[in-house]
C-alpha cells in the first residue's frame, strides 16, 4: 500500500509498505529515498511518536495515510564562550 511521509519543509515522500512492516522498515525506506539515517528520524502518526518495533497494522495505517517526519538531531554541549 502507498503511504506518504511529510517532512517539516512540506515535501511529501511516497513509500510502498506492507501492513506487516515495522516502523523500523518504514524508516529504512525513507533513508533510501532521502538519505536520512533511521536513528535521526522520528515518525509521527495521529499525534503520537511511532515505536520502531510496532507494525503499520498496529497503528492502523491504511493506504493514503500521511506520516510526519521530524528530525532528531543530536544535541550539542551548551554554549561556547
Swiss-Prot record:
SMART domains: UBQ (SM00213). Pfam families: ubiquitin. One of its GO terms (molecular function) is ubiquitin protein ligase binding. Changing residue 31 to Q: Decreased interaction with B.pseudomallei Cif protein, leading to slightly decreased deamidation. It comes from the Eukaryota. It is found in: Nucleus. Residues 77-81 form a propeptide. GO terms for cellular component: cytoplasm; cytosol; extracellular exosome; glutamatergic synapse; nucleoplasm; nucleus; postsynapse. Changing residue 72 to R: Prevents adenylation by UBE1C. Residues 70-72 are annotated as: Interaction with UBE1C. Keywords: Acetylation, Isopeptide bond, Nucleus, Ubl conjugation pathway. Its main location: nucleus. The record marks 8, 44 as: Interaction with UBE1C. InterPro entries: Nedd8-like, Ubiquitin-like_dom, Ubiquitin-like_domsf, Ubiquitin_CS, Ubiquitin_dom, Ubiquitin_ubiquitin-like. Cleavage of precursor form by UCHL3 or SENP8 is necessary for function. (Microbial infection) Deamidated at Gln-40 by bacterial cyclomodulin Cif produced by enteropathogenic E.coli, Y.pseudotuberculosis or B.pseudomallei, leading to impair NEDD8 ability to activate cullin-RING-based E3 ubiquitin-protein ligase complexes (CRL complexes). Deamidation occurs on NEDD8-modified cullins. NEDD8 deamidation prevents switching from the inactive to active state by maintaining the 'closed' structure of the CRL complexes. Deamidation may also impair its deconjugation by the COP9 signalosome; However this result needs additional evidences. Belongs to the ubiquitin family. Ubiquitin-like protein which plays an important role in cell cycle control and embryogenesis via its conjugation to a limited number of cellular proteins, such as cullins or p53/TP53. Attachment of NEDD8 to cullins is critical for the recruitment of E2 to the cullin-RING-based E3 ubiquitin-protein ligase complex, thus facilitating polyubiquitination and proteasomal degradation of cyclins and other regulatory proteins. Attachment of NEDD8 to p53/TP53 inhibits p53/TP53 transcriptional activity. This is Ubiquitin-like protein NEDD8. It comes from Homo sapiens.
